């Protein structure tokens, strides 16, 4: 890694520390937390952070595949919303408790998200729509249709509670002190995340498809010249973003056991944070996953701080911790190089 890039990535750590120090210094009551806060960071906290990492990291990795292909998909938030709503709606329709129903609900959510991503791809690739506007449309449509669907089905924007995913302990490993319950006694979407991160890196960097995908976003004309269909590559990249968001949205919803449609819905900006993670990670799935865990960890921390008895801190103030950290870290990271042809339409006849 060259010196400027190393310096920029080191700024991420510095930014995180400064953000936390700022909160500690500015918020009355934080200085008195002391040992209570230290006690929060246990195996249960790590499991909670990993659960919250799932939608952010999968959205971030999905965004990498789309943008590397040359299509900027800022509709990740909308895809997560569609997936979360579909998962709970199908789970509720099937009775809401058994493992088979959860599996069906999970796949239904992935299919729904991938279908919306396909429509987005068609609008952008075939009809050459502005990708930013189309992505915003996906988000706004999802933000309206999911709560509306909730009202139609349940007569309220929030669904009734359904079953939640059980943790799956791995024999022997789950019994290790601290690390065992934190990493090896988690739910299926978290295990999927552990597999998806190295798989995504390998797919992007060590396969012919990955090379074609990156060429599609850097120099589609050259890729077309050697006989590779740029349209198909871009469709595949966007569809992968839909599949990944489907996994992330379904994972969050089925871990929660309810769809919350009020306000920004239960997704609550995680798709937007997913975009920042791959910018921070410079379009590297591993970097995006690490950034996702950092922000999810802050999210989990603010939830724990609100729960601790005796700490009188505004829940609204504590809730902005992850978003303040996003701004600080992005400031320290600086410019990230986008694919040269990202956002540009390609017509082989031109």
Language-model regions, residue ranges each:
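Cytosolic-side transmembrane-helix boundaries in multi-pass membrane proteins
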Residues: 1-27, 225-232, 305-350
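Short loop segments and helix-boundary regions at transmembrane helix junctions
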Residues: 2-7, 67-72, 116-173, 266-269, ...
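Hydrophobic core segments of alpha-helical transmembrane domains in multi-pass membrane transport
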Residues: 12-26, 59-60, 84-87, 144, ...
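Single transmembrane alpha-helix segments in multi-pass membrane proteins
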Residues: 43-106, 110-111, 116-132, 279-284
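Transmembrane helix-bundle core of multi-pass membrane transporters
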Residues: 143-203, 309, 313-314
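Helix-loop-helix "hairpin" substructures at the membrane interface of multi-pass membrane proteins
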Residues: 185-260
């Amino acid at each position: 890694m060259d010196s400027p890039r190393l310096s920029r990535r080191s700024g991420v750590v510095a930014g995180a520390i400064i953000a936390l120090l700022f909160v500690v210094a500015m918020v009355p009551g934080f200085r008195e937390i002391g040992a209570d806060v230290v006690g929060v960071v246990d195996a249960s906290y790590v499991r909670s952070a990993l659960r919250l990492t799932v939608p952010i990291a999968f959205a971030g990795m999905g965004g990498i595949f789309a943008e590397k292909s040359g299509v900027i998909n800022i509709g990740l938030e909308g895809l997560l919303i569609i997936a979360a709503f579909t998962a709970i709606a199908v789970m509720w329709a099937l009775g809401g408790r058994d493992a088979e129903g959860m599996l069906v609900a999970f796949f239904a959510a992935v299919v729904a998200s991938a279908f919306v991503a396909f429509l987005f791809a068609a609008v952008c690739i075939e009809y050459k729509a502005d990708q930013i506007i189309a992505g915003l449309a996906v988000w706004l449509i999802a933000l309206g249709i999911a709560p509306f669907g909730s009202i139609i089905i349940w007569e309220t924007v929030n669904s009734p509670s359904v079953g939640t995913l059980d943790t799956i302990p791995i024999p022997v490993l789950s019994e290790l002190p601290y690390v065992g319950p934190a990493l090896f006694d988690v739910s299926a979407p978290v295990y999927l995340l552990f597999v998806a991160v190295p798989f995504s890196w390998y797919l992007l960097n060590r396969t012919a498809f990955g090379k074609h995908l990156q060429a599609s976003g850097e120099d589609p004309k050259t890729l077309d010249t050697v006989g590779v269909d740029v349209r198909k590559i871009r469709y595949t990249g966007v569809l992968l973003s839909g599949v990944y968001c489907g996994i992330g949205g379904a994972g969050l919803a089925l871990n929660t056991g309810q769809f919350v449609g009020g306000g920004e819905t239960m997704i609550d900006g995680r798709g937007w944070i997913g975009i920042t993670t791959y910018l921070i990670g410079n379009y590297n799935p591993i970097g995006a996953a690490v950034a996702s865990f950092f922000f999810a960890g802050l999210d989990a921390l603010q939830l724990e701080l609100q729960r601790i008895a005796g700490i009188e801190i505004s829940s609204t103030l504590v809730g902005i911790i992850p978003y303040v950290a996003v701004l600080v870290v992005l400031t320290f990271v600086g410019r990230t190089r986008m694919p040269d042809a990202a956002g540009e339409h390609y017509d082989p006849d031109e």
